[in-house]
Amino acid sequence: MKLRKILKSMFNNYCKTFKDVPPGNMFR
């Protein structure tokens, strides 16, 4: 569960940094 928390925080940081880029592009 710790890993999930870290991934979620990284995902949130990504969203804050690149608000104009759809987050889906990072995982496809």
UniProtKB/Swiss-Prot annotation:
Q: Which InterPro entries match?
A: AzuC (IPR049862)
Q: Which UniProt keywords apply?
A: Cell inner membrane, Cell membrane, Membrane, Stress response
Q: Which residues form a coiled coil?
A: none
GO MF annotation terms: enzyme activator activity
Q: Does the keyword NAD apply?
A: no
Membrane protein topology class: Peripheral membrane protein
Q: Where in the cell is it found?
A: Cell inner membrane
Q: Which GO terms describe its cellular component?
A: plasma membrane
Q: What induces it?
A: Constitutively expressed. Repressed in minimal glycerol medium, at low oxygen, induced by H(2)O(2), the thiol reductant diamide, at 45 degrees Celsius and at pH 5.5 (at protein level). Transcription is repressed by CRP.
The protein in question is named: Uncharacterized protein AzuC
Q: What is the lineage of its organism?
A: Bacteria, Pseudomonadati, Pseudomonadota, Gammaproteobacteria, Enterobacterales
Gene designation: azuC
